[in-house]
Structures are given as structure tokens and as C-alpha cells.
Regions:
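Hydrophobic positions on the alpha1 helix immediately C-terminal to the Walker A/P-loop
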Residues: 135
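Conserved Rossmann-like nucleotide-cofactor binding loop
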Residues: 131
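Conserved adenosine/adenylate-binding substructure
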Residues: 191-212
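Glycine-rich Rossmann-fold phosphate-binding loop(s) that bind the pyrophosphate
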Residues: 128
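RNA-binding accessory domains that recognize and position tRNA/RNA substrates
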Residues: 1-122, 138-196
Length: 212
């Protein structure tokens, strides 16, 4: 798998980050992976650029499930993220759910690509589930508010649990769920960010095995 052609499209309502995903070991067409962020903070907008971390985190499980030998990303993701993904794959394998070997992550040298210059700050995924809420509580207990690791932003994602089927976007359900989380986020001092992705529309394992 190759992840390349990072881009940004701005509109009055949202900022869309995109990348082209090319399959190497599966007979699947190139696909565009997007993350659409609404109500982005001004300090983030000023330094906006595609982040290799986000695309690697999204594409690594896809590459692993579909039997890609590698995932080559035209960027320089965080080494800690790479180590964490390898660790996660080891867990998946120990649980008996991985039919293929772990894909190797290949990155571009730092000299060949820019390093994000924006402010560093903690961010989390929040769906309202117990695990996410526990993680947020533990983070706020462990770090001081002045620490960059202190979580101040939380992503609520359309296209993951809600709206993961293209034929049924569930926009009203997503809106209600988002609004129900806003008081909780405000109480925790976290800014809740609406994000949409099309990752769930990528090839499903059943189709990939049939094509393979």
C-alpha cells in the first residue's frame, strides 16, 4: 500500500484533508481517503497541512487486514506512532484475528518532507463509550493543563460507528449524538470536533479475499 498525494481543500464550512491510497498486493483501484474537519480552531488553521500520522493510523489496519506487505507513506509520521501500531498488530495477532503477516511501515527521510510546525496539543477520540471517557479522565489526572499531552480536543467521527455505510449516512443520528456529548465535553474542558471520514467505504475484507 502506498499513501501519497496529500492535499487540503478549504470551504466556508470545513477543511478537507485527503490522500491517495494505492494498493500493491490487491487488485483494487486507487482510492481517496479524506478527513473533513468542521469548526477547526484558529490556531490550527493557521498551520494547516496534511498530517501523515492521521493517514498512517487509518491505513495501517486496512493494510494489515488485506494482506499488504508494506505501507509506504509519503511523509514522516511520528516514530512513537509507528512503534504503537506494531504493538497493536502484535496484540491482534495474539488474539488470533490476523490472517496475514504484519505490513512493514516505510517512510520518507525527514530531509525530504516537512515536519508540522503547528502547536503541539493532546487530542482524543470520543464516542461516549466507557473506554474513551476513562482515557480522558486518566489523561486529565496524569497531566497538568499546561502540558502539551493534556487533552484539550476530542474528535467525534462520522463514518466510524455512525454513518459507516454510504447508502445510509445517518446524519440526524450523528447530529443528536454529537449534541448529547457537547455538555460532557464542556464539563471536561474539552473542545468537541466534528470529523467525517470515508475510510469505512474502502474495500471490505470479504470483497478483498474474493478478488485475491
Amino acid at each position: 500500500m502506498i499513501v501519497r498525494n496529500f492535499g487540503i481543500v478549504n470551504s466556508s464550512e470545513a477543511r478537507i484533508y485527503s490522500a491517495t491510497v494505492s494498493w500493491e498486493d490487491r487488485e483494487l483501484p486507487d482510492q481517496e481517503l479524506i478527513f473533513e474537519i468542521r469548526d477547526e480552531a484558529p490556531e490550527h488553521s493557521a498551520h494547516a497541512e496534511p498530517c501523515a500520522d492521521a493517514f498512517l493510523a487509518a491505513c495501517f489496519p486496512l493494510a494489515a487486514i488485506h494482506g499488504e506487505a508494506r505501507i509506504r507513506i509519503h511523509g514522516q509520521p511520528c516514530p512513537l506512532l509507528i512503534e504503537g501500531l506494531y504493538t497493536a498488530h502484535a496484540w491482534w495477532t495474539s488474539w488470533g484475528g490476523m490472517p496475514f503477516p504484519m505490513p512493514l511501515i516505510e517512510t520518507f527521510p525527514r530531509a525530504d518532507c516537512g515536519v508540522p510546525a503547528g502547536p503541539r496539543r493532546g487530542v482524543a477520540f470520543l464516542s461516549g463509550g466507557v473506554d474513551g471517557l476513562h482515557m480522558l479522565m486518566q489523561n486529565h489526572r496524569r497531566y497538568d493543563p499546561e502540558d502539551p499531552a493534556y487533552i484539550r480536543d476530542a474528535l467525534f467521527i462520522h463514518g466510524f460507528d455512525i454513518g459507516k455505510r454510504a447508502y445510509n449516512p445517518e446524519l440526524e443520528r450523528f447530529r443528536k449524538a454529537f449534541e448529547s456529548l457537547e455538555p460532557l465535553a464542556a464539563d471536561a474542558g474539552v473542545r468537541l470536533i466534528s470529523c467525517r471520514t470515508n475510510e469505512s467505504e474502502f474495500a471490505c475484507p470479504v470483497r478483498a479475499r474474493r478478488l485475491g
